[in-house]
């Protein structure tokens, strides 16, 4: 239960710490537990997507979009320095104090790759804020109210007040979370971590009993007795 609590709260999952604290006597047990809990989060997010609940925008919810590169770490920091990295496309719905991210690993940052993802998850007619990346030039024609910020000149547009600080903060949270979760060695593992982050914002933070209450609820859904 202590491990489940730490996982649901996004706390650091270093095996050496938990072994020293007596949470478990085996590192392999911890690895299996983490794998199972990531699976629980992924299943919960997939259920939401099948129901059509994983959408953002409209009704006073502004959507911030951006891309960020996540480098893959070498195991034990050995071997050649790896240049492998994955681009992640982030869409963040912001309404009052609520933050709801959708995070997708993408092969390219072109309009051809990004626009279909955005149109699938962001409701048409929404206000979308981005930087000046050319892949977003067609947003207005696609039915969105598009605001841009030219970071080469300003961080906040003086006329519209548009900025990208919300999603920049999200990237900081995402990368810190991936770092705590024993690094990000493959694209597949990165996708798992991103699903856990989505779960935290969409489910863990809104349950009346907090993230622990929601992870226990989702465990029962995935592994009914």
Show which residues each predicted segment covers.
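Residue-level recognition of single "structural anchor" positions
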Residues: 1-225
């Amino acid at each position: 239960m202590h491990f489940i609590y730490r996982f649901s709260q996004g706390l650091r999952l270093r095996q050496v710490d938990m072994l020293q604290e007596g949470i478990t006597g085996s590192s392999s047990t911890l690895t299996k537990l983490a794998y199972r809990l990531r699976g629980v989060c992924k299943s919960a997010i997939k259920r939401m997507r099948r129901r059509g609940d994983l959408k953002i925008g409209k009704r006073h919810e502004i959507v911030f979009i951006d891309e960020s590169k996540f480098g893959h770490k070498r195991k034990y920091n050995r071997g050649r320095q790896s240049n492998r990295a994955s681009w992640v496309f982030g869409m963040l719905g912001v309404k009052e104090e609520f933050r709801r991210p959708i995070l997708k690993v993408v092969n390219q940052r072109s309009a051809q790759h990004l626009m279909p993802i955005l149109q699938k998850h962001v409701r048409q007619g929404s206000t979308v804020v981005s930087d000046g990346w050319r892949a977003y030039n067609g947003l207005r024609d696609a039915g969105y109210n598009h605001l841009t910020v030219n970071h080469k000149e300003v961080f906040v547009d003086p006329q519209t007040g548009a900025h990208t600080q919300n999603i920049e903060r999200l990237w900081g949270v995402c990368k810190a979370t991936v770092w705590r979760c024993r690094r990000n060695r493959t694209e597949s593992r990165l996708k798992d971590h991103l699903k856990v982050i989505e779960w935290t914002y969409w489910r863990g933070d809104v349950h009346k009993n907090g993230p622990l209450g929601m992870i226990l609820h989702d465990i029962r859904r995935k592994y009914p007795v």
